[in-house]
């Protein structure tokens, strides 16, 4: 794998030196980038099980995408929303066309992040993450996608998961402004847009909890259903004041439902990150913060106890009915 990257980098440096005059203009750069993506597509299709060739083709495709992005930036102006929308379309097309797992993860993530940046440029603050969460929940909760086209949708699901966590992190630390610059949204949207976005994400979390309960045969009125939905509502309410919390819990919940350790690990990592940021950004004394942590811990322990007791009672009831 590493040998493929080294070989591709040296080859591209040599070719880039020879075609430096071409990439100074937008149209030739886009043509050259499309040609490299086409070459990567051919390599992926012809050498599906060759690690060296696959890594080589991945580097070639990434460079091609960079050239296409440069050309689009020259034509559409890199600070505008049309550039990011066009880039998202290109990345989504590559994710559909090129049949490689890692390539699809990266291009899906690139498309989702480009779409989020377009939403940011349009001053729709806080609305990118819930939009991506809808797609994330739909993919990981729909078994027919996995049964029919798992080779396509599995990497797309991973790419969306990485993108939504990165988008939340970028927004949390204002890193998106490094790319798009500071924008001036309408006053009401600047005040309430992020809160609306967190509320929508919390609603998605509750919807996922209801869907998972029904899939396991527990109605919303059952003990397990009420406990699960109540826990989701509790986390949703907490997330209104803790950016990123609902997204991390959503990823963790989807990972647990799918039995996917990667999703669970990244959900837990995101949970620690967003809770830590919320803790250190609180304008409170250390005593008040410690009290908040203690109360949160007791609430979580109480929720765990109720869920365990409800599960045991439900299992005993089913055994008695049988």
Predicted segment positions?
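Alpha-helical multi-pass membrane segments and their bilayer interfacial helix-loop junctions
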Residues: 1-322
């Amino acid at each position: 794998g590493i040998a493929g990257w080294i070989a591709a980098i040296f080859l591209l440096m040599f070719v880039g030196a020879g075609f430096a005059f071409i990439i100074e203009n937008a149209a030739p750069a886009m043509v050259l980038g499309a040609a490299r993506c086409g070459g990567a597509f051919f390599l992926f299709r012809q050498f599906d099980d060759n690690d060296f060739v696959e890594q080589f083709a991945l580097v070639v495709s990434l460079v091609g995408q960079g050239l296409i992005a440069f050309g689009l930036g020259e034509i559409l102006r890199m600070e505008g929303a049309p550039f990011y929308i066009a880039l998202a379309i290109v990345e989504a097309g590559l994710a559909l066309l090129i049949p490689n797992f890692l390539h699809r993860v990266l291009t899906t993530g690139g498309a989702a992040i480009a779409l989020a940046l377009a939403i940011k440029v349009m001053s729709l603050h806080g609305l990118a993450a819930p939009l991506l969460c809808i797609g994330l929940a739909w993919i990981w909760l729909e078994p027919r996608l996995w049964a029919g086209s798992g080779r396509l949708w599995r990497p797309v699901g991973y790419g969306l998961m990485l993108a939504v966590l990165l988008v939340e992190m970028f927004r949390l630390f204002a890193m998106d402004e490094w790319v798009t610059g500071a924008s001036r949204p309408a006053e009401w949207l600047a005040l309430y847009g992020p809160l609306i976005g967190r509320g929508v994400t919390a609603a998605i979390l509750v919807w996922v909890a209801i869907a998972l309960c029904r899939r396991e045969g527990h109605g919303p009125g059952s003990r397990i259903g009420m406990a699960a939905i109540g826990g989701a509502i509790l986390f949703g309410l907490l997330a209104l004041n803790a950016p990123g919390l609902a997204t991390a819990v959503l990823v963790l919940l989807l990972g647990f439902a799918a039995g996917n350790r990667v999703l669970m690990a990244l959900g837990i990592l995101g949970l620690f990150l967003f809770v830590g940021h919320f803790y250190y950004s609180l304008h409170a004394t250390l005593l008040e913060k410690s009290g908040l942590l203690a109360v949160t811990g007791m609430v979580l322990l109480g929720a765990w106890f109720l869920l365990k007791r409800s599960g045991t009672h439900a299992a005993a009831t089913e055994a008695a009915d049988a």
